[in-house]
Amino acid sequence: IYIGSNEVSLKIFEISAKRGIRTIDYVRTRIELARDTYSIGSIGYELVETLCDTLAEFHKIMDGYRVDDYEAYAAAAIRDAENELFVLDQIRIRTGISVTVLSNSEHRFISYKSVAMRENFEKMIEQGAAVVDVGGSSMQITIFSEGKVVTTQHLGIGAIKLQEQLVRKSSNLAQYELQIEELVEKQLAVFHAMYMEQQKVKYLIVIGDYITEIAGKVKKNLDETVESSKFNEVLEKLSQKNVEEISEILGLS
């Protein structure tokens, strides 16, 4: 179970000596916990109710599959909330699920472990790669060259955090895209000047919500890489749509 900034998800795995690790179910529910955390500082009672109800349903699903064991993790949205302990206590009392809150370094480590399992990962980092982990509260960039880590930098430009900053600054929705672009480019320009002048990146490995859905519109087999030009074409088409249309196209509605 993963409690993220924008959604809560449950994956059921079957583990056997013959088949290895196989995903047999994947359930996702959109709950924007980070919206409360980064606007009012804590998670509101209504969202706590919704979260507990969702996790109770997850528990029923686990019972249906007769799971032998589980792990439940939460990241920044709960970690940064002033009422973190209250939320965790409510979850435990009302659902019986014990949640482990990951530190930033623990969260990134687990994410990078999953990326490193790819068969061609070693080849990518040998030729030059950037692993970009985009979360709700922050973004972390790790640059690899000749198979070694060159630098890892933490930037405070997560998706939800950016959104909340813009809501406070302006009510003009038409300007959001331009303002987001300016904020991100400003931080990336500093990063590029400090760490990228002498580096060549051939592969961009992105970790984050919905990146799989977007990449899936370019190529069905996501075990392979996606050409950046084709990926940008999909992004350009999506930028012409409204939120409802994008949700429908990506199968998120």
Question: Where in this protein do the model-derived segments appear?
Answer:
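A generic structural motif
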Residues: 19-24, 66-68
